[in-house]
Design a protein with these regions (language model features):
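…primarily DNA-binding HTH/wHTH and HhH modules…
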Residues: 3-28, 32, 36-39, 128-156
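DNA-binding recognition helix and immediately preceding turn/loop
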Residues: 34-87, 107-117
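Short alpha-helical elements of helix-turn-helix
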Residues: 40-48, 91-98, 123
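Short hydrophobic/aromatic patch on the recognition helix
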Residues: 76, 80, 125-126, 130
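Terminal helix-turn-helix DNA-binding modules in bacterial transcription factors
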Residues: 82-118, 144-156
Length: 156
């Protein structure tokens, strides 16, 4: 008998970088509602701790995460690989790029500000990795995905 462990996706555990979002209720009233930054339980203590850490701290390397948890990088990488199907470094990359996407779609922050907030050493590195992953520059992504009235829809 084989037991399959369901893989956890970035979207399932991602914690928004936004502070509030405009919500319209059934009666048609619109109101800025705070976004819940609590961890959505994944069923894994390791994953929940990792997501909390990535949300609160600007960590760039898997070794930094392993040091924080006082674990060997190899052991932590193996656990994340079992839980997500990807290495710790790949998970961290995709998690940070998800943050970049959200900032691009919902804010007027510059590439330099976004790269700093997402833990990149500079905007060139962020842009290179973004292009490599999504096949377009951050500016092109922003142009294609940010609504005209973004500043009325989101608070960051």
């Amino acid at each position: 008998m084989t037991i399959t462990i369901p893989q956890i996706s970035i979207d399932e555990v991602y914690i928004s970088v936004l502070k509030a979002k405009l919500v319209t209720n059934e009666e048609g009233w619109s109101k800025m509602m705070p976004i819940d930054h609590a961890v959505r339980p994944s069923g894994s203590i390791i994953m929940d701790a990792l997501v909390t850490l990535l949300h609160k701290k600007r960590l760039y390397y898997p070794t930094e995460v392993a040091e924080y948890f006082q674990k060997k990088t190899r052991d932590l990488d193996g656990a994340i690989r079992v839980l997500t199907g990807m290495s710790l470094s790949r998970f961290m990359l995709l998690y940070r790029l998800k943050q970049v996407q959200e900032y691009l779609c919902c804010t007027s922050l510059t590439a330099i500000e976004i790269s700093s907030r997402c833990g990149y050493p500079n905007s060139s590195t962020m842009g290179y990795l973004f292009r490599k992953e999504f096949g377009m520059t951050p500016g092109m992504y922003r142009q294609a995905h940010r609504p005209r009235n973004y500043n009325e829809l989101y608070a960051w």
